[in-house]
């Protein structure tokens, strides 16, 4: 982390306003970002993430590192609107709403942290990133590569301040050894379908029912829909616990 902090300081000295940290899960991205905020000493900071649970843990870590009173840190999400604090921890879902962004000036925060920045190509993230003009913006991720080909590095000026992948983290004993269980599939094919709420064998469908089913399947296979679903599956399955999903079409 010392190397990363030195690199970040050097990038800012060179006039760069954006950088990205690629760090395997469990190697201390949150604490690293907190230490960088401590050395920058911004007037106001915004920390963006997808889940409120992540924000609450980050808030605890930042308070330990910064040594500031809890009253200086605030949660900005669906159930909490502490946007007037010095250090604001916000869900991207809440912050990206147009009516919410309209409440903040472009230079409201002079340091912005974007966690799980591999999602930055999503419209919600783009609205937040495009709206604000901080002195410095730091993106953090363990997996910068995206299946849709979007280049996250370009969003941050191709400034990789520090990179440590999973294999290197294991070799340097930064992480405990673990067993990896691959998930081969997320869905299970059913032997029949439901038409108007009734179970119908596929082979016994009428031509009209088959055409209707084909239309539904074409809509489900829309590339944008598929990418969105894959992104959500990856987010909610990261914890390694069994996940069930329900789709409406």
What does each model-identified segment do?
Residues 1-15:
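N-terminal pre-P-loop "Q-motif" helix
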Residues 14-37, 248:
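Walker A/P-loop
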């Amino acid at each position: 982390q010392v190397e990363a902090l030195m690199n970040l300081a050097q990038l800012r000295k060179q006039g760069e306003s954006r950088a990205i940290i690629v760090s395997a899960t469990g190697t201390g991205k949150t604490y690293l970002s907190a230490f960088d905020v401590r050395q920058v000493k911004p007037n106001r900071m915004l920390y963006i993430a997808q889940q409120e649970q992540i924000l609450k843990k980050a808030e605890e870590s930042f308070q330990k590192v910064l040594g500031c009173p809890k009253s200086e840190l605030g949660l900005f999400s669906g159930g909490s609107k502490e946007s007037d604090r010095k250090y604001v921890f916000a869900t991207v879902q809440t912050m990206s709403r147009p009516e919410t962004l309209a409440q903040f000036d472009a230079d409201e925060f002079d340091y912005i942290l974007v966690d799980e920045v591999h999602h930055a190509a999503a419209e919600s993230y783009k609205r937040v990133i495009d709206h604000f003009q901080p002195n410095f913006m730091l993106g953090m991720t363990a997996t910068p590569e995206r299946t849709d080909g979007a280049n996250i590095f370009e969003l941050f000026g191709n400034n990789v301040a520090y990179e440590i992948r999973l294999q290197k983290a294991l070799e340097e004993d930064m992480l405990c050894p673990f067993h990896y269980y691959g998930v081969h599939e997320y869905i299970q094919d059913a032997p029949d379908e439901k038409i108007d709420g009734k179970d119908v064998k596929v082979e016994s469908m009428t031509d009209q029912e088959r055409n209707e089913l084909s239309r539904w399947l074409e809509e489900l296979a829309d590339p944008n829909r598929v990418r969105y679903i894959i992104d959500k599956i990856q987010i909610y399955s990261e914890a390694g616990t069994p996940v069930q999903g329900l789709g409406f079409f």
